[in-house]
UniProtKB/Swiss-Prot annotation:
It is an enzyme of class 2 (transferase). Pfam families: FA_synthesis. This is Phosphate acyltransferase. Catalyzes the reversible formation of acyl-phosphate (acyl-PO(4)) from acyl-[acyl-carrier-protein] (acyl-ACP). This enzyme utilizes acyl-ACP as fatty acyl donor, but not acyl-CoA. The gene is plsX.
Length: 330
C-alpha cells in the first residue's frame, strides 16, 4: 500500500509531517510513503528509509492562496503533485495539512468524484465522552446543500462508521434545532423524511448540545451548519482547558490538587484530542483524501496516515460507490 503525503502542508511542515511519516512506516510494515515537497527542506529532517521516497515539488500552495486559482496555476505544487500520484495510480490515498479549499479542489478535479456522488463531504471524527467518537459531515465542503446531498452524506458516513470505526449498523442522526420530528427549516424537514425512507439506522434529529454525549455514530448536516458546529466544539474545548489551567495554577493549594489530578487530566485531554481520530476525510472521491488539521504535530499526522491506511484496506471508496449505486437503482 502506498500513500502520498504533502510534506509542505500545515503550520509545522515539513518537520511534523516527516515525524508522523517516520512513525507510520515503523508501525505499519505494509506501508510505503511518497513525500512530496522541497527536497532540501525534507532532507534536513528525514532519516533515510527504504519505504519512504521523496518527490521534489518546486511550489507550495499557501494558506492564503485562493483555492481554485492556486490548484490551476501551481501545477508543480506539493499538493497538486500529491493528488496526481493518486489519480495516476501510483498511490492509493493522499494526506495534506495544507489549504483546505485547495485540497478539496484538488481532490474533486484531480482525484475525481465517485460516479453518482452529487457533492463530496468533509468529515472529521470528533471525540465523545465515552471516547468512541462520532463522524460529523459535512463541515464545509458545501455550504449549501439539498436533502438528496444529506442522504448521500448519511450513506457515506454509515459505510465509514461500519468499515473504519467498527460500528455495526451505525446510528445516523440529523443535526437540528430540536429532537421532534417536524423541527427545523425546510432542508431539515425534507431530509428527515428522506432518511426515514432509507434502510439506514436513522435515529432522528439530534441537537448540537448532545453531540459529544455520543447520541449518534454519524451526524449529518449541511456544510455551513457543520462548520459552525465544528468550530464551536473546538473553541469550547480550548477555552475549557485554558480555564482549567488558569484555575489549577492560581494558588499553592490548587497546584497541589493539579499534581494529584495530573494522570486523570492527561487521560481526559487524550480522550478529547481530535488528533487521536485522524484527519477529516473528503468523502465521495475515488480514493481516500485526508485533510489533517493545519496545526498538526507529528502525532496528528501519524493518525491521519493510520486513518488513510484503514480506509484503503477496508475498500471504503468501493463500498461507498456500491451503496450509492444501490440507492440510485431503487
Amino acid at each position: 500500500m502506498k500513500i502520498a503525503v504533502d510534506a509542505m502542508g500545515g503550520d509545522n511542515a515539513p518537520k511534523a509531517v516527516i515525524e508522523g511519516v517516520m512513525k507510520a512506516v515503523e508501525d505499519f510494515e505494509d506501508l510505503e510513503i511518497t513525500l512530496i515537497g522541497d527536497r532540501e527542506k525534507i532532507a534536513a529532517h528525514l532519516t533515510e528509509h527504504g519505504r519512504i521516497t521523496v518527490k521534489h515539488a518546486e511550489e507550495v500552495i499557501e494558506a492564503t492562496d485562493e483555492p481554485v486559482r492556486a490548484v490551476r496555476r501551481k501545477k508543480n505544487s506539493s499538493m497538486v503533485l500529491m493528488a496526481g500520484e493518486v489519480a495516476e495510480g501510483r498511490a492509493d490515498a493522499c494526506i495534506s495539512a495544507g489549504n483546505t479549499g485547495a485540497l478539496m479542489t484538488a481532490g474533486l478535479f484531480i482525484v475525481g468524484r465517485i460516479e453518482g456522488i452529487e457533492r463530496p463531504a468533509l468529515a472529521p471524527t470528533l471525540p465523545t465522552v465515552s471516547g468512541d467518537g462520532f463522524l460529523l459531515l459535512d463541515v464545509g465542503a458545501n455550504v449549501d446543500a439539498k436533502p438528496e446531498h444529506l442522504v448521500q452524506y448519511a450513506i457515506m458516513g454509515s459505510v465509514y462508521g461500519e468499515q473504519v470505526l467498527g460500528v455495526k449498523n451505525p446510528r445516523i442522526g440529523l443535526l437540528n434545532v430540536g429532537t421532534e420530528d417536524k423541527k427545523g427549516n425546510e432542508l431539515a424537514k425534507q431530509t428527515f423524511q428522506k432518511l426515514k425512507e432509507t434502510d439506514l439506522n436513522f435515529i432522528g434529529n439530534v441537537e448540537a448540545r448532545d453531540m459529544l454525549d455520543g447520541v449518534a455514530d454519524v451526524i449529518v448536516t449541511d456544510g455551513f451548519t457543520g462548520n459552525v458546529a465544528l468550530k464551536t466544539v473546538e473553541g469550547a474545548a480550548l477555552s475549557i482547558f485554558k480555564m482549567l489551567r488558569t484555575t489549577l495554577t492560581s494558588s499553592f493549594t490548587a497546584k497541589l490538587a493539579a499534581s494529584a489530578l495530573k494522570p486523570k487530566l492527561k487521560e481526559m485531554k487524550t480522550k478529547m484530542d481530535y488528533s487521536e481520530y485522524g484527519g477529516a476525510g473528503l468523502f465521495g472521491l475515488k480514493a481516500p483524501v485526508i485533510k489533517a488539521h493545519g496545526s498538526s504535530d507529528g502525532r496528528a499526522v501519524y493518525h491521519a496516515i493510520r486513518q488513510a491506511r484503514e480506509m484503503v484496506s477496508q475498500n471504503v471508496a468501493a463500498f461507498i460507490e456500491e451503496k450509492i449505486q444501490q440507492k440510485a437503482d431503487e
